[in-house]
Amino acid sequence: MIKHTLLMPFFFSALPAYAGLTSITTGYDFTDYSGDHGNRNLAYAELVAKVENATLLFNLSQGRRDYETEHFNATRGQGAVWYKWNNWLTTRTGIAFADNTPVFARQDFRQDINLALLPKTLFTTGYRYTKYYDDVEVDAWQGGVSLYTGPVITSYRYTHYDSSDAAGSYSNMISVRLKDPRGAGYTQLWLSRGTGAYTYDWTPETRYGSMKSVSLQRIQPLTEQINLGLTAGKVWYKTPNHNFNGLQLGLHLKWQL
């Protein structure tokens, strides 16, 4: 606990002195797996700041994974930079490090490129490298498109994964976001389906087979500066040994500054 407390001053001091803080978010996520697959708890704090053409994100998370008689705790720090190069090119660079446990990926690096080449259309491509507990490494390449039609944003993304000790795998994800007629609130739905090398958990069985998931999120403004986020979802795993599922619940508060 002392180590985690000492990380907080560094977390806040990581912002450049000239950066303009735009939001602070705190949240909690919980996943309960069926059968004897345990559960996962995650609490986090997040800062977003604006520096000229760049948007900076800093996130500090504390997680716990319980599985039968095994219990794991870990801390993760991550950062990301969105940079708007011009009216049609935006990039996102992200990096994260965590304790060497099954709770989080030990190392995570991603680079995304967003191209606004057509009106009301955004193309995305990118690469992600992830190193998990027990030195499992995954390379991922993704491409997708988002369409903006009035209050609705519809997105599709395809991702191909290469794992260091499992066959290649893939995922397809569709999301639909509906903005409220007035205010900053919105509701978003995610649907995904794919094979399992990228769904790494600390048990090797989750690296094989297939999965599908559904998630629904509601962002509800409470005041002009505070938004409440509520998320509920479910994921189904089909592995060579047996099938199981996970129920996901999340809550966060975001202060706009």
Question: Where are each of the predicted segments found?
Answer:
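Short beta-strand-to-coil "C-cap" segments at the C-terminal boundary of structured domains/repeats
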Residues: 177-178, 253-257
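Beta-strand-dominated lipid-handling architectures at cellular/organellar boundaries
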Residues: 20-25, 38-40, 244, 254
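Short, exposed beta-strand/loop patches in secreted or surface proteins that constitute
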Residues: 47-49, 81-82
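Cleavable N-terminal export/targeting peptides
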Residues: 1-23, 52-55, 88, 257
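Outer-membrane beta-barrel translocator/channel fold
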Residues: 29-44, 59-80, 94-112, 116-249
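Short linear interaction motif-like sites in intrinsically disordered regions of transcription factors
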Residues: 83-89, 203, 256
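Residue-level recognition of beta-strand termini and adjacent short loop/turns
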Residues: 52, 84-86, 90, 118, ...
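Transmembrane beta-strand segments of Gram-negative outer membrane beta-barrel proteins
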Residues: 18-30, 49-58, 91, 187-190
